[in-house]
Every structure is written in structure tokens, then in C-alpha cells.
Amino acid sequence: MMNRREFCKKAMIVAGGLVIPLTALEVFNPRRLHAEKGGKSKVRWVFLVDIHKCVGCGFCVKACKIENEVAWDANVTRTWVERYVVTKDGQVNIDSPKGCRDGFTSQKIDQASVGLKEIKPEDIAKGFFVPKLCNHCDNPPCVQVCPVGATYQTQEGVVLVDRTWCIGCGYCVMGCPYGVRYFHPELHVAEKCTLCYHRLCKGMKTACVDACPFGARQVGNIRDPGDPVTKIITTQQVNVLKEEFGTKPQVFYLGLSMEVK
């Protein structure tokens, strides 16, 4: 028997003599409707990363995989850490072996299939680590391109994926300019960072924030002027990734270098 996902992929609607692919329509999703019509919340979750404090230990990645049951050995992760090594001649070298799940065990740059690249210490101008995750944008393109409403935004601004509605079309994966989405290796539906929404709803911090021993990651309510994260964002120089795309990302960075894309 054909399930709903298979039906949605193959279904065509005939109207007025025209054949219209179902992917051109918006399928009703009651959960998304509730998220859109629930009114403005007093909470808008945002994330803050302090580049100066990140040491690339990988504890955050481990914690995320365990908390959210992300396949341990599969080459997928909801959050990861990139290592940047900038040489004096201006070359930018970036790696993130296993998403930094095990930290950075070698001083050499992991170039995947190309192999390891050794950079002499005297040639290095600067080096730093950059944690990345879903930006839970105010204007999320992934929500806009999903043809069945499986990707939606909560009243608190968290972007989620409803596995039971996702048909695995991949539009959201291709539509995300941050490359934070992937296909679940077994369920074949879109997956991403949920900002540990299940924990936030219980008054807990995200798993990655709890796991970071140096306070490089923080989560807060931008609509609360007394929130420590809000105070930092409103009083210090912070940056976001790919601001030019107009997605209005809500992951803010302290100490973000111009080399980071």
C-alpha cells in the first residue's frame, strides 16, 4: 500500500484541464497553522557564540548527537565546529573532521580525500574555531520552499521539521544558505538543529550549551531585556553569517572574523 509520503511525491491534481504537481500547492498542516496563528510570544529564542572562548574540544557535538539521537558514525551532525587557519600569505584553510565530534586530534588540516595538509607554525597568521548550527532565521527560506508545510516556525522563533509530514523532496536542504540540513540516513526525511526545543520548553538549556566547559555557547530570550544574552547582543559588537541573504539569522557571534563564511 502506498503511504502518504509516496502519494505526495507522485500525486498530480487535475483542475480545469490542467495537470498541476502537488509540489506546486501548499498542503494543509494543522501544526504549522497553529504556529502561525498563535500570536506573538513573549519569548524569542536566540543563540550566542563567543569565538574567543571556543577551543574546538567537540563536547558540544558529542552532546548534541547523544541528546538528539543523531547517528554517531554517520557523516551527519546537527551542529559542528570548523577550524580556521589563516596563513601570512592570506590563504584560509578550513577543516572539521567528523564535525569536530572528537575534537581536533591533529595539527594538520584535514582536506578529506586530498589528505592532511601541514602548515608550519611560523607561516600561521591566526587560527580560531567557529561553531555552527541552524540559524533559526526570522525569515527562513526553508519554511518558504517546503511544499507540504513540514518545516515550520514556532511562536518562539524555533524552526522545526515534522517528520510525519516531510516527504523527503529536499527543497529545504537545497534552500538553506547555511548548509545546516541533511537527510536522516534511515528515515530519509530532512533533519537539522532544533535548538533543543524539547529542552527549552522545560526551562532547560540546549545540550550543547550545557556541555560547553568554556561558556562559548549561550541561548537566551531576545525579548527579555534582562536576559544576559540580550544584554550582550544589544551592547557589544556581534555579527551574523551571510547577512546579505536577508534571512535574518538569529545566531549571533562575538569575535567573528571576516574569513568566516
Where are the regions that the model predicts?
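Non-ligating segments of multi-cofactor redox enzymes
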Residues: 1-261
